[in-house]
Amino acid sequence: MHRMGTWYGIDSYVASLNAKAWQDRKAHVEAMISQAYKYMGKPWLTGCSSSPAYGVNYSGLVMQGLYAGGISPVPTSSIGHAHPGNEWNSRNLGADKHLKRVAYSQRRRGDLVFYYQLGTHTIWHVAIYLGHNRVIESWPPCVMVAPISNSQHNVIAGIKRPFI
């Protein structure tokens, strides 16, 4: 059982579904982005996919947004996120065949932006595209809106569209 105000169960939080199955893509995208904005200014916490009361890391932020929009990103999960070996769930999301790959030039609000670690071809970061070359992401020190390409993340691995 999750006890609020403690670290017990911090990664057992799953955002409530905020879009109905019959609603259009826009409703699902806005539910995802609305959930992400609940974390604005909250601390970046390594390996964390918790409630907005605590904070999240980058893939935790995306997972909570996906839950709110109506996607359970199995086998990636909030509960398993803190377990050893799952720290890099951005890689798992990037490899997820259920998420449609789209060209960078075709990116749209609600798409996921994946980044390579500098000097490698290893995915190490993910953010939610807001439009107008801006993303919402969790990166030290906190959840923020940033340019799609910036000094920390400037090698884009690809774009995936969770809501078709």
Q: What are these model-predicted stretches?
A:
Residues 9, 13-19, 51, 84, ...:
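Intrinsically disordered, low-complexity, compositionally biased regions/tails
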Residues 26-96:
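Secreted/periplasmic proteins that engage bacterial cell-wall peptidoglycan
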Residues 1-45, 105, 153-164:
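Intrinsically disordered, low-complexity
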Residues 59-60, 67-69, 135-137, 150-152, ...:
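Short, surface-exposed linear patches
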Residues 24-28, 50-57, 99-105, 119-122, ...:
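Extracytoplasmic/periplasmic, Sec-exported soluble proteins
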Residues 6, 11, 56, 113-114:
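Intrinsically disordered, low-complexity segments enriched in small/polar residues
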Residues 71-145, 149, 164:
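...with weaker cross-activation on analogous glycine-rich loops/strands in unrelated enzymes
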